[in-house]
A protein has these predicted regions:
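A cross-family phosphate/adenosyl-ligand binding-site feature
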Residues: 1-9, 20-104, 111, 115, ...
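Short, glycine-rich nucleotide/cofactor-binding loops
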Residues: 8-18, 180
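Short, ordered loop/turn segments at secondary-structure junctions
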Residues: 10-13, 41-46, 76-77, 113-116, ...
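Short Gly/Thr/Asp-enriched flexible loops that form oxyanion-binding sites at enzyme active sites
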Residues: 20-24, 114-128, 188
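Short, acidic/small-residue loops that bind anionic groups at enzyme active sites
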Residues: 32-33, 123-147, 151-154, 201-208
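Accessory alpha-helical/coil subdomains and C-terminal extensions
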Residues: 99, 110-112, 120-122, 150-171, ...
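Short, hydrophobic alpha-helical segments
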Residues: 165, 220, 306-313
Length: 358
């Protein structure tokens, strides 16, 4: 009798999702042949709740190694609403368990970020056989040194910074580039260093706007006619750090600032007299073909997950720890975020290069 493996992709998309799906599938088919059946669950947990399943064939996993996005579709389904019965009267947790069993699944693989893993842990606690795979361009999943999608996003954000240099220099401007990362600054830190940013602002290190302005002025005094700021979308000031989140978000709204980057650009212009511009690459950082690094990582993670399925090792998520692929208990990582620590080597590199961290 064939083992039936469900698989879904949930949350925001990123490069490497399809490569990971392929890694799982090819390894399972190679190991088990016709003794495994893969069931695709469309649009993440929404598909699990509503029974939107698709029987997959081996051919559907061919030719997708280099393809961005996800062949299964994805959708954000907030964890905080999982146990909330809304107007549709659907008990989401009960529906997911019912549809899992109706499809006669032996296990379910959940590809996603922090919220996806919280729900994966919930389902594991509810008695389902769950395996997680860590996906996010933010690189902020606890317990793993790297997530697939991160390095491709670094490449994309770095190219943006590279290209901004020439226009910044030509027009003698201060360019503020908003990089994705609401709670963790890994993407901004790595792309900022790789792209030669002069100032890098992260959520983990509240910035002093006076120091930011001083860094711009010091470059001007040194004969540099432009400055590049790499700003994480979740960056906030030392003044805001003293307030509750609702308070400082309200103050930003009252002042007409939709983002931290807009506020910083305006303040720098007022304090230095330098002409400033904002660049927001946005969802470009999540799109397109995965890098060679992410293709390899996705294949590693996918093949390892297939081994976990074969060994019936559930209630875990795949991780890279000290360059070795392993598995962490879902209960140990769910609800935790891996931010840039204060003793991070890359912060020391930035400081050694004279990059201002605000």
């Amino acid at each position: 009798m064939a083992i039936r493996v469900g698989i879904l992709t949930s949350g925001g998309d990123c490069p490497g999702l399809n490569a990971t799906l392929r890694g799982v599938a090819k390894a399972l088919y190679h190991r088990m042949g016709d003794k495994v059946e893969i069931v695709g669950i469309m649009n993440g947990y929404d598909g699990l709740i509503n029974g939107n399943f698709r029987e997959m064939s081996p051919d559907e996993f061919s030719g997708i190694l280099t393809v961005g996005g996800t062949i299964l579709g994805t959708k954000r389904t907030p964890f905080k609403k999982m146990r909330v019965v809304e107007e549709d009267k659907v008990d989401k947790v009960a529906a997911m368990k019912k549809n899992y069993r109706a499809a006669k699944l032996d296990c379910l693989l959940c590809l996603g970020g922090n919220v996806t893993h919280k729900t994966a842990n919930l389902l594991s606690q509810e008695g389902l056989n769950i395996i997680g795979l860590p996906k996010t361009i933010d690189n902020d999943i606890y317990g793993t040194d790297v997530t697939f999608g991160f390095h491709t996003a670094v490449d994309i954000a770095t190219e943006v910074i590279d290209r901004i240099h020439t226009t910044a220099g030509s027009h003698s401007r201060v360019m503020c580039i908003e990089i994705m990362g609401n709670k963790a600054g890994w993407l901004t830190l790595y792309s900022g260093i790789a792209g030669g940013a002069d100032i890098i602002l992260l959520p983990e290190l509240p910035y002093d706007i006076k120091k930011v302005a001083a860094a711009v002025e010091n470059r001007a005094k040194a004969g540099k006619n432009f400055s590049i700021l790499a700003v994480a979308e979740g960056a906030f000031s030392t003044e805001e750090a003293k307030m509750k989140r609702k308070e400082w978000t309200a103050k930003r709204a009252e002042a007409g600032y939709t983002t931290a980057t807009a506020r910083i650009a305006k303040q720098v212009e007022e304090m230095t007299g330098a002409e400033t511009r904002i660049c927001v690459p946005g969802h470009m950082q999540r799109g397109g073909s995965p890098s060679a690094y992410d293709r390899v990582l996705a294949t590693q993670f996918g093949s390892y997950a297939a081994g976990l399925v074969a060994d019936e090792h559930y209630g875990v998520t795949v991780a890279m720890v000290n360059r070795h692929v392993t598995a962490n208990p879902l209960a140990d990582i769910a609800g935790k975020t891996r931010g840039v620590p204060g003793d991070c080597d890359m912060l020391n590199v930035a400081r050694a290069m004279g990059i201002s961290l605000g």
